[in-house]
């Protein structure tokens, strides 16, 4: 499994958590029955668990940049994509350009026609306001 596939799995797990509120350990267990994450296991677990631990903070950032979109009106898959990407940039030491590009590609694959532009715009505004540059990450 490569990092792109692992990131898709993270988004799927965050989506599953949002719609089911199953314990994250159960969600991880169910996904691992499907496919062995191999070298990406640490990234997957750190990102899923970290995004859930920081869910309130991440959701405040999403609300701040969503231009009058309430979280409960957004497609759940878009929320999962945004949560993954913001977590990566804020806490996961992932370069901004990689995280945004991957988020947009995942949106093209799994979400609505308008979602890639929405996600790109929201994440771009987040990066500008956080003072992150292309290729950088926040080293929290």
Curated annotation (Swiss-Prot):
List GO BP terms, alphabetically.
Answer: DNA-templated transcription termination; transcription antitermination
Protein's UniProt keywords contain Transcription regulation = yes
**Which InterPro entries does the entry mention?**
NusB-like_sf, NusB_fam, NusB_RsmB_TIM44
Among the Pfam families in the record, one is NusB
Q: Does the keyword DNA damage apply?
A: no
As given in the record, the signal peptide range reads none
Q: Name one GO molecular function term.
A: RNA binding
Q: Which keywords, in A-to-Z order, does the entry hold?
A: RNA-binding, Transcription, Transcription antitermination, Transcription regulation
Example of a GO cellular component annotation carried by this entry = cytosol
Job of this protein? Involved in transcription antitermination. Required for transcription of ribosomal RNA (rRNA) genes. Binds specifically to the boxA antiterminator sequence of the ribosomal RNA (rrn) operons.
User: Which family is this sequence assigned to?
Assistant: Belongs to the NusB family.
Xref: PANTHER family: ANTITERMINATION NUSB DOMAIN-CONTAINING PROTEIN, N UTILIZATION SUBSTANCE PROTEIN B-RELATED
- Listed name of the protein: Transcription antitermination protein NusB
Upper lineage is: Bacteria, Bacillati, Bacillota, Clostridia, Thermoanaerobacterales
């Amino acid at each position: 499994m490569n990092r792109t596939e692992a990131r898709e799995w993270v988004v799927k797990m965050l989506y599953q958590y949002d719609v089911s509120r199953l314990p994250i350990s159960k969600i991880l267990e169910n996904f691992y029955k499907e496919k062995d994450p191999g070298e990406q296991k640490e990234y997957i677990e750190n990102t899923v668990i970290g995004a859930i631990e920081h869910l309130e903070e991440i959701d405040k950032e999403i609300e701040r940049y969503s231009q009058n979109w309430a979280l409960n009106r957004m497609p759940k898959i878009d929320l999962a994509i945004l949560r993954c990407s913001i977590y990566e940039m804020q806490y996961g030491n992932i370069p901004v350009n990689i995280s945004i590009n991957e988020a947009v590609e995942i949106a093209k694959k799994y979400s609505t026609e308008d979602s890639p532009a929405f996600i790109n715009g929201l994440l771009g505004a987040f990066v500008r306001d956080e003072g992150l540059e292309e290729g950088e990450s926040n080293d929290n």
